């Protein structure tokens, strides 16, 4: 039984999570500089460690209903191609789960495409949707986000 740590966050009223090993840092919300002619899911950029960090809005990317949240956070994600931030409504907790507890998403009826989903985790009365960060951006979208 392998235990992994996941970062649980909210988009709207739903719980989502990602492996904590893919997360570099959690930032408080800060003003995002908008970029002209950018894809709708790319909210813009922020200054992060003296470089430019693209900010991906998962609510827009997944086509979810936007809710006003005063707890918005930016999760800084490490990828081989570079770093980017994902804008979330709030961050809930870091939780230890067993890999065996991650269920196959095939039976899932959800508002977001299954291609983004790594699996489902039952947590008390809630279902946490595990996001596959490798599939958030297509190759073409990565080129736009990282090459500008």
Indicate residue ranges for each PLM-predicted region:
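An acidic, low-aromatic, low-complexity terminal/linker signal
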Residues: 1-148
